[in-house]
Amino acid sequence: TRTDSSAASDVYKRQQLPYPLMNIINGGAHANNGLRIQEFMIRPDRAKSFSEAMRICFVVIKNLSKLIKDKGLSTSVGDEGGFAPMISSNNQALDLIVSAIKKSGFVNGKDVSICLDVAANELYKKNKYSIHSKSYISVDKSIKEYQKIIKKYKIKSIEDPFAENDWLAWNKLMKSIKKVQIVGDDLYVTNLERLKKGFLNISSNSILIKLNQIGTVSETLDVIKFAQTIGYKTIISHRSGDSEDTFIADLAVGTNSNQIKTGSLARSERVAKYNQLIRIEEELGKKARMNKIN
């Protein structure tokens, strides 16, 4: 879809495929288990093609399913297609994912990276957070807990680590950790003015793009263009309640966005986007390239 927006001036010239941020374990508001973090995802960082990225994710998911079953837990899925086992510890979920990556023959943090969507709005009360357990702790203590899991599990991306209006907490986190993708979703809601404020505040280094948050394609393109101009990574995203429409797959390629977040390899409304990206890659043929992560 082309538009006359100034933001669209050259974004269509590139032909690069986004890396998938694939949901593999659901928690928070997307599942009925006790996990505090809403989404546990993987990103196949060394995939040379989108088709290979899908194969890598499939193998990890298959082995994760076996590991969950071996523990006597259910492999039923949550809203976004990831498994929703009845476990209550973030570390338990992360341990399972690390084991699945290793069992698949990949190296965690190199071949495949773990990424999180904390959705901290749901875990915020009176300037404190219950991200890592049911107990509410201060921002500074929460940052220390983030530092621990980043080091232990080689986490490469964290979305919405703090509440949407806790600007100081976001800035503190950005100053405290390096080489981690800090993604604003609720922080920005695909709104150009909030993105400009976040940039001045040094709140994040990446933005999640949801087309229907801002309402029009033109406004969405303006946000993407500005984000890319200031050096932010752009991640095109589905919604937790979605349809089989595949437009965001085309949007991700057309705007040269680094990554796409569209659920797991389950549920037709999620898989449809991945299938469209495979079709795009096939159509591009030898011109097809994967985007850059770093």
For each of these PLM feature ranges, what is it?
Residues 1-8, 12:
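Single conserved hydrophobic/aromatic residue that forms the stacking wall/gate
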Residues 9-10, 54, 82:
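Metal- or metallocofactor-binding catalytic centers and their adjacent structured scaffolds
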Residues 10-13, 25, 46, 188, ...:
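Acidic, glycine-rich active-site loops and adjacent beta-strand->loop/helix elements
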Residues 15-78:
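Mobile "lid/hinge" segments at catalytic clefts and subdomain interfaces of large enzymes
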Residues 19-35, 79-83, 118, 244-247, ...:
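Conserved phosphate/anionic-ligand binding catalytic regions in large, soluble enzymes, centered on
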Residues 39-50, 74-90, 119-133:
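Active-site-proximal beta-alpha loop/turn segments in soluble metabolic enzymes
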Residues 64-68, 72, 82-84, 93, ...:
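Gly/Ser/Thr-enriched, mixed-charge loops and adjacent short helices
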Residues 91-294:
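Catalytic core of soluble alpha/beta enzymes
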